[in-house]
A protein has these predicted regions:
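A C-terminal junction/extension of Radical SAM enzymes
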Residues: 162-167
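Radical SAM/AdoMet-radical enzyme domain recognition
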Residues: 17-34, 41-160
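Canonical Radical SAM [4Fe-4S] cluster-binding loop centered on the CxxxCxxC motif
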Residues: 1-14
Length: 167
């Protein structure tokens, strides 16, 4: 993704529904909602429900987790709409890592997001962006944390940073 990729307008909800109806093969389609930060959309639970109604077998969310931590009602709405799984940005077990990569302390936020997802039976996969000399030394701690949070945390997907495109 490109953090400075420029602003654009989100698709209208009705347009999203049209795309889902056109593209989904009932019972065989998995949709992952991502791009920018999907949880800035108040209608995301309705989009999840529309994907399920169109026949999506699995609906996944790729998120930074901030709104999931701050708004448990939103998490409940996503779960009730049929969200299957959450892939959450999770860069390490030390706020210094978050300050270096994200500009602020976020470890407590990430933990709260996991707790809120667990309360609503949403599985979470942690997604660390690995940056040499920033958080690669924390890989073992991330794995140990993931194991300690089972069954809520169900996996870790490491993404090595790649410097290309717009910076």
């Amino acid at each position: 993704c490109f953090a400075e990729g420029g602003a654009g307008e989100d698709l209208a909800f009705e347009t999203v529904k049209e795309h889902l109806r056109a593209l989904v093969v009932p019972g065989k389609t998995l949709v992952q909602l991502s791009g920018g930060e999907p949880t800035v959309r108040d209608d995301l639970p309705q989009i999840v429900a529309a994907a399920k109604e169109a026949g999506c077998q699995y609906v996944q969310l790729n998120t930074n987790g901030i709104r999931l931590a701050e708004d448990e009602g939103y998490v409940r709405s996503l779960a009730e709409a049929g969200l299957s799984f959450v892939f959450m940005q999770f860069d390490g077990m030390d706020d210094g890592i978050y300050r270096a990569l994200r500009g602020r302390d976020l470890l407590g936020v990430k933990r709260q997001a996991i707790d809120n997802c667990a309360r609503h039976n949403l599985g979470v996969t942690l997604v660390p962006t690995l940056v040499p000399q920033v958080n690669t030394q924390d890989i073992g701690n991330i794995i140990r944390f993931a194991v300690s949070q089972s069954p809520a945390v169900r996996g870790v997907h490491f993404q090595p940073v790649s410097y290309f495109g717009r910076i």
